[in-house]
Amino acid sequence: MAKQNKGRKFFAASATAALVASAIVPVASAAQLNDFNKISGYAKEAVQSLVDAGVIQGDANGNFNPLKTISRAEAATIFTNALELEAEGDVNFKDVKADAWYYDAIAATVENGIFEGVSATEFAPNKQLTRSEAAKILVDAFELEGEGDLSEFADASTVKPWAKSYLEIAVANGVIKGSEANGKTNLNPNAPITRQDFAVVFSRTIENVDATPKVDKIEVVDAKTLNVTLSDGTKETVTLEKALEPNKETEVTFKIKDVEYKAKVTYVVTTATAVKSVSATNLKEVVVEFDGTVDKETAEDAANYALKSGKTIKSVSLAADNKTATVTLTDKLNNNKADAISISNVKAGDKEINVKNVEFTAVDNKIPEVTEVKSLGTKAVKVTLSEPVENLSSTNFTLDGKAYFGNVVMGAGNKTVILTPYSSSALSVGDHKLTVSGAKDFAGFVSLNSTHEFKVVEDKEAPTVTEATATLETVTLTFSEDIDMDTVKASNVYWKSGDSKKEASEFERIADNKYKFVFKGSEKTLPTGKVDVYVEDIKDYSDNKIAKDTKVTVTPEIDQTRPEVRKVTALDEKTIKVTFSKTVDGESAIKTGNYTVKDKDDKVVSVDKVTVDSKDSKSVIIDLYSKVSVGENTITIKNVKDATKLNNTMLDYTGKFTRSDKEGPDYEHVINADAKAKKVVLKFDKKMDAASLADYSNYLVKINDTLQTLSEDVATLSVSNDATVVTITFAETIKGDDVVFASGKAISGSGKVNVNELQVMGVKDTSGNVHKKFNGSENKITLSSTSTPLKLAKIDKDYDAKYTAELVDRKTVKVKFSTVINSAAANAFTSESHKIDSIQVNGTSTVTVKFKDEINTNASDLDLKVNLSKLVDIAGNESTNNTPIAIKAGINLLDSVAPVVVGEPVVDKETITFTFSENLTSVSIGEVLSTDFTVTRVSDNKDLAIKDYSVAIANNNQVVITLSDNREVATAYKVTAKNAKLITDDNGDKKNAIADFTKTTATKVEASGTLSLDAAKTNLNNEITKAKDAKATGTEGTAATNQIVGSKDALQVAIDVAELVKNDTAATLQQLTDAKTDLTAAITAYNAAKVEDISSLLVAPDLVLGTTDNGTITGFVAGTGETLKVTSDSAANVEVTDPTGLAVTAKAKGEANILVQVLKGDKVIKTGTVKVTVSE
């Protein structure tokens, strides 16, 4: 077989991997070496390591034969074993038979280029290997390099030429070191190499070429993290792909610097790292198993657990192994239904267990059983059951074959029951039998009859305290035996401040022998450090009283845990209950400003008041001014503190809560169709139960003044519009008489029958709520021959009733009607200003009008009219009113569209100006206004601080951003508005904040300080000239468009200040720049200080009064801080009732012009007139 060299770097890597693996996970020796003591001392370690690694084995007799020479076949076998080589092909040496023991080893080493034949046809497997030949195969196989000096060896001259370079390299690498004889060091290059010497040089070679350090130590940090230390001192943190199972030896594979290692590690867990499992085998308990031990106090704190279903947690107990917590509920779980539990703040060593929504399914399929009956002395017996049961009574028990008579007290968690017989001799010392029957668990399963023997032993030992823990607000005591709960009082436990007793305020039974005592109020909370707690007058069930002056010393743990929101519940439409994880501080908990409630439309529902629940100090009750939505609502809570001494403050919380539908439906519209149609259409404000709407027994009708149940021969019922509408269509005749809608009885023999009243009874919505009018007189609908007219209706409950339409986007207007619209003609809506794209009728009382082009954001350019006669309502009514009704901005159109930026920003020196689509206003000024924007300097991509720019509204519809940052170079700026709140449109009742935008200036703003002093003075002087011109051209007065009186004086003050700076020879560049900025702002303010003409704001035509009438001028509303001044130019005809109001009184026929002025302080800022005509 020809020599094949597959690349010798493989060998070094293989050797490293093989021997490193053997160092970590040693294998058993293949054979016991009986002659190990015959191995020379220098070779024992090398031989032992190769034997341990399974590389070298003893012979059939268990001997290594260390001094025997090694053959080429044996050397090939060592290579193959050490490097775990395998041959892919065959060898064709005539002296290597396929059945020879060395065939595979020779095939593998030849194929991998370690050995070659002595000729093309022979390998010479039994030929002894010389020391020179050993050097050659080791140097070639592992690509050793180096230059050694052989002159130090006495027999260097005997080295054959072909072997010289190999031996030099072997010596340089410390593989071959020579041997001492007669004071000389010899190589013995041509001597056969012994088995022990080959083991030594092979091991030396492996150690030499093994540049990869070995694993020295592995520390398991957690389930997925190892800290690995290598033999060269390298330390690496390794993250495993798969988490280790606690307390189980696991083989892991990992890489460090591209070298793969294997090791066996054990993740030893004593304290918990996670929740291992959650289960519920009954409906009152949830069992949480941790993967290690947890802190008893935090694990037994019910506040640290919450169920997704909202079920209330009563208590938590931790098993003796400190790994299993049993959560007992006040409510019961739903059998065979999934739920989830969240756990927080449970301590485990230096960590905390915090998990969200670990799912489990409650499965209770077993009957309850009695697990123990135990005597509590001669006066009581305790029964323990396998699971919580419903309250038991004396009928569930038989004592010694007789009916039981006595007290029955359920223990903590309803898993135990204490029986105290009335007869003092019933539990005499000795053996007794108790039969228990009919114990029902919370899934409804009932226990079988079972009889239990127990022994009564007289109890004369008083209870003692075996364990006591404390926080600054609580003391938890565990007693040596079950305590008679009738003897436990809050005042039994106290601590002393001097001679003053600080008694507990309340207590909670955690277990039959464990109670928590709560100390409320700053005057009762325990001090820090060690404190003595006294326990008095507590008894066991044998009337043994705890020793007088019993005291325990506790060191209260300071509670630094923040309160958390555990549950939010809508108690009704205007009341919310919030439950926290711990008792809350009353002062912070009742502040209404700490709570923000929003309905499903994201509108704020104002909070009226907040009180701490009198029954639960962990809960607050929130009363609202108005209703929350049926379905999902949002609540945000902040700044609430707990009642601990530290007053820990909660983190801000925002969450959803659901209000179930408990409100009865109401009529949205009642339509009485004309006499010909004989229809009544009822439109409800929510989806109804269709079956109840179609049930004739839910309606009464008065026919000829006689009330009777509606029937099919009187009318038909038709349910439509997704069960929100029912149409009652009356028959044309009843028993041959024509049906008419009229009051009273029809004249006998007239051939008519009067139908005059309909009563709607028990119709229900889909949640089963009966409609609101069911129990009152309002369920009566009077029927008449007059049909209900179609009208426009209020579009939004939160705004004035005048608004009957809404601009919802720049191509859409919605119009609200008094009833459901069935159809609209193509010309029902017309517009001369914008082309209508479509009219959408969707089976509701709202019609949507779509336009082809965009409307101004304030709808100032919209001219829309609706013709009611072109619409047909759900009752089939067609209006007779064919006069188109105008829908106009500021009149009856509600603007819900945000102002938008028009065009690109304009840069002028240090200002950036944005023009908007309509006039703007704001609720703030200056630095606060800047929070509506993010300004980014493009040159270094830095967001400016608020102090580095200011924002102002200019020329009514512009926003000017003035920069004051330090710009090292000329740069563009990117301005972003997102969720702005402070700058809104100035159009109508609804204030729409400016729309989101991001704009980058095309022009760069010059670098700071690039302006010269002379240029700055010139700029300031130009601005002063501009200010003087503005002042000179303006006219102060009270007429519309006049400058507001006093505005010139204000501008002059700003001019004077600017001139002082300009004339100051020591003025700095910054002072000149600031003065110019201030004067620019003053000019802007002056230009805006004009008396506004408010005549256009009239919403009604000029008043017309009779000579005896009083009237009110509409359309004028004074804003905050504004007053009205109203005068008449003809008081003889019309007198102003109150000069600060809008009421007028007619005096005589004629006309009067009423001047209405709006004052801010004593300055007129708005003015308008209205003509009032007095007729006869």
Curated annotation (Swiss-Prot):
Cellular component annotations (GO), alphabetically ordered: extracellular region; S-layer
Pfam families named among the record's database cross-references: SLH
Main location: secreted
Signal sequence region: 1-30
InterPro entries in alphabetical order: Cell_Envelope_Struct_Comp, Cu-Rt/internalin_Ig-like, SLH_dom
Stretches assigned to the SLH domain: 31-88, 89-152, 153-216
Compartments where found: Secreted, Cell wall, S-layer
Domain of life: Bacteria
Keyword terms: Cell wall, Repeat, S-layer, Secreted, Signal
General function of this protein: The S-layer is a paracrystalline mono-layered assembly of proteins which coat the surface of bacteria.
The protein, known as: Surface-layer 125 kDa protein
Organism: Lysinibacillus sphaericus (Bacillus sphaericus)
